[in-house]
C-alpha cells in the first residue's frame, strides 16, 4: 500500500515517526514523508523519501505573542490532573482559540496544507499517518478518502483536553459555542470541497508509543506500539571512550533536540550545573553545543563534554540521566531502564515527569525558582544514584515497553485497519 507520513518541520516531532516509516518500508510498502522544506534534509538523512510542501512555518514568533496567562498554563499543564476547576468553558475556549491561531494554524499553514492535499490527490495514498499536531495530514486524508492514523510520541494530553472541552461545550446552547479548532479545520476542509468529521481531530485510530502505565485510558481505537529510538541528525557513532569501564557510575546530562534548537530551556546554566554535579563520585557526560563551551569554567577530570551523542548509544551504559523532560529523551531512557532526573517545565513534559516519579523510576524537579538550583539538582541526582528503588522502577517501565509490539509487528494491524477505513477507489473528494 501507499503510505503518506506527515510531520511539521521540527526534528523532535519528526524523529518519533521515523521507526514506523522504516517498518512500513521494510514490509514492502511505498512510503513518502511530507513536511515543510526545512525538514527535507532530516527526512532524506533518515533514508526516507521527502515531499517538500508549502512554506516554512514561523511558529516560534507566533507562540511568543500568545497571551501570557494562557501560555503559562500550557507550559505547566498540571491543571489537567490537579486543578480541574480551571478546565471551564471560558478557559478552554480561550486556550483553544489561542493555540489554534498561534500554533496549529502556524505549523499547518495554508500553503503547506494546500500542497499536501495536491500531492495526496495525485499520489493517492491508502493510509496517511500524521504526527498529532500535523492536521495537514488529516485534511489530506479526509479530502482524498485515505485511512488516517495519529502517531503519538507522548501521552495524549491533546485529546484529553479536547474531550473535556467538547463536554463543557455541549452543556451550553449551540449559539454560545465557540470551537476555534473545529472552525479552522472546517474552513480548511471546505476550501478543498470536503466536510469536517471527528477523524480529523482523532484519526480513524491512534498509534500509541507510550508504555501502558503512562497512557490515558480511552475508548477510541488504539494500536500500542513500542517506542524505538531515533536521534535524527545526531551521529549514531560509538566513541572509543564509551567502551571503557569508567570505574564509577556514568551520568548523562542532556538538553534534548528541541531545547538545543529553539533556545527554550528549563535547565540551569550548564557551567554551574556541571561543576556541581562533578562533586559526585560519578563520570559525568554532558552534551553542550560547541558555541556554549567557551563559557564553561574549568571542569574536573570526571566531566566529559561532547557536542552531541545519540542517546541510544550512551544511555545503556548510564546509571542515571538528567534532562529537560522531552519525549524522546524520556522514552529512550525508559526503554533502557535508566533512572531519570527530569527538570521538566513545559507541555506534556511536566505530566511525563510526574508519572516518572509516581512510578518510582526517577525524580521530577521543576526547574524554575529555587527548587532547581545546581546544588539541589546535585543532591537529587545523588539520591537517584544511591537508592536501588529508582533502578527497579525504571526496570518495570522497561519491561512494559519490551512487552509492547515493535513497529514491524504492528504493520499487519495497520494493513487491516487501512483496508477497513479507506474509501473505495474514486470516492474521495479529490480523485
From Swiss-Prot:
Q: Does the keyword Signal apply?
A: yes
> What residue ranges are annotated as transmembrane?
none
What organism is this sequence from? Answer: Streptomyces peucetius
Q: What is its biological role?
A: Involved in the biosynthesis of the anthracyclines carminomycin and daunorubicin (daunomycin) which are aromatic polyketide antibiotics that exhibit high cytotoxicity and are widely applied in the chemotherapy of a variety of cancers. Glycosylation is a prerequisite for biological activity of anthracyclines and requires DnrQ which seems to act as an activator.
Q: Which SUPFAM superfamilies match?
A: UDP-Glycosyltransferase/glycogen phosphorylase
Q: Please, which domain of life does this record's source organism belong to?
A: Bacteria
**Pfam families named in the record:** EryCIII-like_C, EryCIII-like_N
**Name of the protein in question:** TDP-daunosamine transferase DnrS
Q: According to the UniProt entry, what is the EC number of this protein? A: 2.4.1.-
Q: Which CDD domains match?
A: GT1_Gtf-like
Amino acid at each position: 500500500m501507499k503510505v503518506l507520513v506527515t510531520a511539521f518541520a521540527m526534528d523532535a516531532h519528526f524523529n518519533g515517526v521515523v521507526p514506523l516509516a522504516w517498518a512500513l518500508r521494510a514490509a514492502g510498502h511505498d512510503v513518502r514523508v511530507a513536511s515543510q522544506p526545512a525538514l527535507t534534509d532530516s527526512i532524506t538523512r533518515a533514508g526516507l523519501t521527502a515531499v517538500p510542501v508549502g512554506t516554512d512555518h514561523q511558529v516560534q514568533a507566533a507562540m511568543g505573542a500568545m497571551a501570557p496567562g494562557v501560555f503559562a498554563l500550557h507550559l505547566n499543564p498540571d491543571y489537567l490532573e490537579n486543578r480541574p476547576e480551571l478546565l471551564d468553558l471560558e478557559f478552554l475556549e480561550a486556550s483553544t482559540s489561542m493555540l489554534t491561531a498561534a500554533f496549529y494554524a502556524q505549523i499547518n499553514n495554508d500553503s503547506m496544507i494546500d500542497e499536501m492535499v495536491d500531492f495526496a490527490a495525485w499520489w493517492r495514498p491508502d493510509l496517511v499517518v500524521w504526527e498529532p499536531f500535523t492536521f495537514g495530514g488529516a485534511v489530506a486524508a479526509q479530502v482524498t478518502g485515505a485511512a488516517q492514523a495519529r502517531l503519538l510520541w507522548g501521552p495524549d494530553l491533546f485529546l484529553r483536553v479536547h474531550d473535556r472541552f467538547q463536554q463543557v461545550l455541549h452543556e451550553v446552547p449551540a449559539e454560545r459555542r465557540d470551537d476555534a479548532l473545529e472552525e479552522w479545520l472546517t474552513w480548511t476542509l471546505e476550501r478543498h470541497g470536503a466536510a469536517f468529521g471527528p477523524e480529523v481531530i482523532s484519526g480513524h485510530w491512534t498509534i500509541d508509543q507510550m508504555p501502558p502505565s503512562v497512557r490515558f485510558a480511552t475508548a477510541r481505537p488504539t494500536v500500542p506500539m513500542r517506542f524505538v529510538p531515533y536521534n535524527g541528525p545526531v551521529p549514531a557513532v560509538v566513541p572509543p571512550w564509551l567502551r571503557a569501564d569508567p570505574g564509577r557510575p556514568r551520568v548523562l546530562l542532556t538538553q534534548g533536540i528541541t531545547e538545543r534548537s529553539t533556545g527554550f530551556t528549563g535547565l540551569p546554566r550548564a557551567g554551574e550545573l556541571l561543576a556541581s554535579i562533578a562533586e559526585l563520585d560519578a563520570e559525568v557526560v554532558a552534551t553542550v553545543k560547541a558555541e556554549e563551551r567557551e563559557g564553561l569554567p574549568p571542569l574536573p577530570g570526571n566531566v566529559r563534554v561532547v557536542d552531541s551523542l545519540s542517546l541510544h548509544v550512551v544511555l545503556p551504559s548510564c546509571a542515571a540521566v538528567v534532562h529537560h523532560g522531552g519525549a524522546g529523551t524520556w522514552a529512550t531512557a525508559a526503554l533502557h531502564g535508566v533512572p531519570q532526573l527530569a527538570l521538566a517545565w513545559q507541555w506534556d513534559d511536566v505530566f511525563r515527569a510526574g508519572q516518572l516519579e509516581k512510578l518510582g523510576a526517577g525524580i521530577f524537579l521543576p526547574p524554575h525558582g529555587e527548587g532547581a538550583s545546581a546544588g539541589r539538582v546535585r543532591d537529587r541526582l545523588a539520591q537517584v544514584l544511591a537508592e536501588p528503588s529508582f533502578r527497579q522502577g525504571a526496570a518495570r517501565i522497561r519491561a512494559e515497553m519490551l512487552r509492547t509490539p515493535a513497529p514491524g509487528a504492528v504493520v499487519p494491524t495497520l494493513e487491516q485497519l487501512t483496508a477497513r477505513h479507506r474509501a473505495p477507489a474514486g470516492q474521495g473528494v479529490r480523485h
